[in-house]
Amino acid sequence: MQKKPMAPQQPTRVRTPREENNEILGIIEQMLGASRVRVRCMDGHTRMGRIPGKLKRKIWVREGDIVIVVPWEVQSDQKCDIIWRYTKGQVSWLSKKGYLKQAYD
């Protein structure tokens, strides 16, 4: 008896960045070590991102991943916290809906 091929899963609900919470989409460019990454944000800035412990324990973040970041109140053009990482299915949904624009090319 053969297994049926699984259909690709469509995301039922995708978390989008909330402007009232100052959230921005970003792409991880480089892993720096010690829970730090370099993130190219959709607002044009390249920031050093910090991966908080609660996120670091649950998921792995790699170069090229699409994430939601929150800039710090101090040094907002240079530093940020990563609060969410998208899966491949969610990234395709975001690109179809126009959230990623030209920065994901």
From Swiss-Prot:
PROSITE patterns: IF1A, S1_IF1_TYPE. Keywords: Initiation factor, Protein biosynthesis. The lineage of its organism: Archaea, Methanobacteriati, Methanobacteriota, Methanomada group, Methanococci. InterPro entries: NA-bd_OB-fold, RNA-binding_domain_S1_IF1, TIF_eIF-1A, TIF_eIF-1A_CS. The gene is eIF1A. It comes from Methanococcus aeolicus (strain ATCC BAA-1280 / DSM 17508 / OCM 812 / Nankai-3). It comes from the Archaea. NCBIfam families: eIF-1A, PRK04012.1-3, PRK04012.1-5. Pfam families: eIF-1a. Disulfide bonds: none annotated. Residues 12-87 form the S1-like domain. This is Translation initiation factor 1A. Belongs to the eIF-1A family. Seems to be required for maximal rate of protein biosynthesis. Enhances ribosome dissociation into subunits and stabilizes the binding of the initiator Met-tRNA(I) to 40 S ribosomal subunits. GO terms for molecular function: RNA binding; translation initiation factor activity.
